C-alpha cells in the first residue's frame, strides 16, 4: 500500500515553471512581501555624484504663509539632507540634494512637498508626504469644462453642503482631499488616489459623487466578509442607468437648406434693374417727368384713403331690428 502511494506521489504532474522550485522554510505567512523597508543612512555609504534639484512657482497670495512656515520646511528637509530655497522675487520654491543626502527617493518627496505647499495645502499635512507609503496627486479640473458657471456648479457639487461630500470621500478612500481653484490636491495611498481621481473626473463629467460614495460603502462592507474575497462583487454593486433629460425646444426652428457646393448668385444691382426696365436709356428730363407722374399717382391714392376715413364719420350706425317688449 505504501509503495502504491509513493508511486502516485512521484507521478504528480508539475508545471514547468515550478519544476525546480524548492520549499522555503524561512518564508512564512506572517511575512509581508509588500512592506516597504525604511531607508537609513547605513544603506547608503557614499554621497551622490550629481546634484538633483526641482523648482515650482507659487501664487502671490501664498507668499505670506510660506514666509511664516519656511523655517519648519527647512528643518523637516534637513533630516533627509535636502536644502530648500524660497525666492520671493521670482515667486518660486527650489529643493536640492546635498552631500548629506542618503535616500535617493527623498528628493522626489521634497518635490511633491513644494508642489502641495504651492496648491494651498497646509504645512502640517503636506509634510506627511515625506513618509513611506504616502503619495500625492494633483488633479487638474480647469480644462475639462468651457462654461465657467457650469464648472463652478460641478466643483461645488464635489465639495457638498458644508463640505460633507468631501468628508465622506476622505473617510471612504482614506485620503486627504483639498479643492483649490482649478486643481484638486490628494494625499494618501496609491489605491485611494486612483479612486479619488476617477470620482473627481466623473464629477466634472456630470456624474454625481453620491453614486461613487454608495459604491465605496458597499465595497467596504463586502471586504469584511472573507468568503467573498475571491468572488466578483458586480452583483452587489448598484447599476445606475443614465437618464436622458428632454431639453427645452428652441422658440424659432430654422429650416436647414440643402447644401450646394456653388455660391449663391449675385443679386442684381440698381444699374442692372434700370437697364432691364429701359429706364437707363431715358434722358434726364424724361426720368424726372416719370418720377413726378409716379409721385402724383401715390398722392391720389393717399387722398382717396383719407377721404374714405373722413366719410366713415357721416355713416349712421345700424339700428337694432329687435322690437321692444311691452310690459
UniProtKB/Swiss-Prot annotation:
Domain KH, by residue range, is 135-205
Keywords in alphabetical order: Nucleus, Ribonucleoprotein, Ribosome biogenesis, RNA-binding, rRNA processing
Question: Where is the segment annotated Disordered?
Answer: 247-274, 286-327
Q: Cross-referenced CDD domains, in alphabetical order? A: KH-I_KRR1_rpt1, KH-I_KRR1_rpt2
- Classification via Pfam families: KH_KRR1_1st (PF17903), KH_KRR1_2nd (PF21800)
Name a single GO cellular component.
nucleolus
Which GO BP annotation is one of this protein's?
rRNA processing
Task: Tell me yes or no: is Ribosomal protein among this UniProt entry's keywords.
Answer: no
According to the UniProt entry, its GO molecular function terms are: RNA binding
Q: Where is the composition biased (Basic and acidic residues)?
A: 294-312
Q: Where in the cell is it found?
A: Nucleus, Nucleolus
InterPro entries per the UniProt record, alphabetical = KH_dom_type_1_sf (IPR036612), KRR1-like_KH1 (IPR041174), KRR1-like_KH1_euk (IPR048550), KRR1-like_KH2 (IPR048548), KRR1-like_KH2_euk (IPR048549), rRNA_assembly_KRR1 (IPR024166)
Name where it mostly resides.
nucleus
Instruction: Note the SUPFAM superfamilies from the entry.
Output: Eukaryotic type KH-domain (KH-domain type I)
Q: Describe the function of this protein.
A: Required for 40S ribosome biogenesis. Involved in nucleolar processing of pre-18S ribosomal RNA and ribosome assembly.
Assigned protein family: Belongs to the KRR1 family.
Q: How does it assemble?
A: Component of the ribosomal small subunit (SSU) processome.
- Protein name, UniProt field: KRR1 small subunit processome component homolog
Origin organism is Schizosaccharomyces pombe (strain 972 / ATCC 24843) (Fission yeast)
Q: Source gene?
A: mis3
